[in-house]
């Protein structure tokens, strides 16, 4: 490729920076001469571009091979962009798929302090039972499958803090109101990979729930499949958990 002439055009300079970024992203690591040849730029120009990327923290040089590669700052930047992506835009197709497979009500919630907020719901496709849950509803964590799924990702100290700051009351005869029992249940959730609401919030309603793990360390979202115990049998729950 013919060598391009130097220019002070800021647009072209930016273009070259991104060309180097894209090339390193594609190849993993490259030497100065490789990049220079591929882009058709003088070695001094490429070296200056690489030094700029290293200075800004987007690239690094292997001291042994002298080759250049991208740093994890790029990954961090991508993660921040993805965190801001509308969760519903990502989750809706999967929630609809779960609804089609199960025929039951499907919920998506996000954590709001010590509570959960329902942000999306698909009603059951079978039967006439309608649960009290609805979009915009705020609910305590301790007596729901989605809440327990989120709590299971938290350290014990934070779980106990949520518990102590919540009003713990019996919603049904099966609601867990003992912290030691809850800690045992959360351990089972971690082991199984899903949480169960076994008529703890509404009599006659059983839910299976799991977290949505994103690009940040903090788990903010969880989803559930909920239905009457006559359809959400133990066997059915195990099938849906697979």
Give the location of each predicted region:
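Short, acidic, Ser/Thr-enriched surface-loop or helix-capping motifs
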Residues: 63, 111, 213-215
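A structural microfeature
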Residues: 57, 118-120, 221
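Amphipathic alpha-helical effector-binding/dimerization core
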Residues: 65, 69-165
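N-terminal helix-turn-helix
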Residues: 2-89
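Short, conserved catalytic or interaction motifs in soluble domains
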Residues: 26, 124, 214
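Extended hydrophobic
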Residues: 174-242
């Amino acid at each position: 490729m013919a060598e391009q002439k130097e220019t002070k055009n800021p647009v072209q300079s930016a273009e070259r920076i991104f060309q180097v970024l894209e090339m390193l992203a594609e190849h993993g690591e490259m030497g100065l001469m490789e990049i220079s040849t591929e882009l058709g730029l003088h070695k001094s120009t490429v070296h200056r571009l690489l030094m700029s990327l290293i200075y800004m923290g987007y690239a690094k040089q292997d001291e042994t091979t002298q080759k250049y590669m991208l740093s994890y700052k790029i990954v961090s930047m991508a993660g921040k962009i993805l965190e801001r992506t509308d969760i519903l835009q990502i989750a809706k197709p999967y929630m609809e798929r779960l609804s089609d497979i199960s025929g039951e009500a499907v919920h998506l919630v996000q954590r709001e302090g010590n509570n959960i907020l329902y942000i999306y719901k698909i009603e059951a496709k079978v039967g006439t039972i309608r649960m009290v849950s609805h979009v915009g509803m705020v609910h305590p964590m301790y007596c729901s499958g989605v809440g327990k799924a989120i709590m299971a990702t938290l350290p014990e100290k934070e779980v106990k803090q949520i518990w102590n700051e919540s009003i713990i009351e019996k919603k049904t005869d099966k609601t867990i109101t003992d912290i030691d029992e809850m800690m045992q249940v959360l351990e089972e959730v971690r082991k199984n990979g899903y949480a169960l609401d076994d008529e703890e919030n509404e009599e006659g309603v059983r839910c299976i729930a799991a977290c949505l793990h994103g690009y940040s360390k903090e788990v903010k979202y969880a989803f559930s499949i909920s239905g009457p115990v006559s359809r959400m049998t133990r066997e059915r729950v195990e099938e849906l958990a697979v």
